[in-house]
Every structure is written in structure tokens, then in C-alpha cells.
């Protein structure tokens, strides 16, 4: 009989992971349940795929990758409407569990949704380098005693620039401008990171998108014909292990 938590997943992948190499990537995805009644783990979530609110299950994944291999090492289900933890709490819990399991990644990669001060400080306590994106309205200062301004207002060269993120400390920020004029701000606590390194890490961060796509298309994670929460959790675990 397999345990109903994520221990079974870890037992399966721990021998395949280089614990002091590679990167950890955290992101979430919505498992579509368009015909299910909102109950148990099925609630309303924003879907990046559909660009609207849909019925489904919100799955958070902690993925280990070295650029050539993708291995899920932990996951959580966001069920806050039923009294569960927030996404940010799940973020910190999975990182704490990863440390207890002996993981020491070269970097932790995640989206701006998880770039709260509490999460960034949790990573600082772990002494793990990170790379994330920040929203354009996050406040920074360039010199001591200077008034804080939105990061979007700061002049940032291609090689990046050190700024003081309000409430956290010094970080290095890179700005990318898309052909349509949209901008993205990438931030790391590694002051020595180059733009080439940032770009390479950003590509590794996209591995979790490939993982989520494979989980849905090849492992049937969205296809469980069950209603109870324990049965759904069991199906999620088996689908992830099948990957």
C-alpha cells in the first residue's frame, strides 16, 4: 500500500537526482475539470492556458532539472477554499522539505506570483540563490537615503544593475524588452550573475511547462472519474509517479 502523501514520489526519484547540482523550479498549473461540480479539490482558478477563470484543480509542483532531465520531487494541491494552505505557504513548505531531504540546488527558479518578501527571505535563510521575475511596481532604491521608486522607472543596462529591493536588500535586476514593447524584470540575489547566465537559467525554468504538458497529455492527470478528495489525491500521485 502506497502512502497518500508525496513520500512515495520522493522514494522513487531520490536515486535519480543529483542533490547538490541542477536547479529547482516551482510553478503551478490548473487541471481542467469543466464538467465537474465545484466540490472537494475542484474549485475555480485562473487558467493561464484559457486566460480566464475555470473549474479545476490547482496543482503546485517542485521540479528538479539539470537541463537534460525533468524529475518532479514534490507537489501540493491548492485547496484554500476548503481551509487549506495558501500557494505561498506551499512554496515555503516544499523548499523546507527539499532542504531536509538534502537538496542544495544551484538556483531556485519561480514566477513573480511567488516573489513575495516572505518567500525571498525564506530562500535567504536557506542560503539558496534564486532567479525570479518581479512586477513592474515593486519598489527599489539606488542609493542609501534615496526615495523608493518602481522598478519600471529605473534605468537598467543589458548587463543588469544592483538595486535595493524595499524590505529585502540588494538584488541584481535585468530588464528584457519584447518586440511588442512589453517588459519583464528578472531579479536574482546572485550579484555575479551575467545576462548569459540569466538567459540560460530562464530556459531551464521553462522545463516545468514541458513537464506539466506531458503530465496532462501522456499521464492522464486530468482524466480521473472520481469525486472524493482521497481518491483524487491518490490519482494525482499515481499520475505524477507515472511521469
Per-region residue spans from a language model:
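Alpha/propeptide regions of enzymes that mature by internal proteolysis
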Residues: 1-2, 105
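Active-site-proximal, Lys/Arg-enriched surface segment
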Residues: 2-69, 73, 79
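Single, function-defining residue in the core of a domain
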Residues: 9, 20, 33-37, 68-243
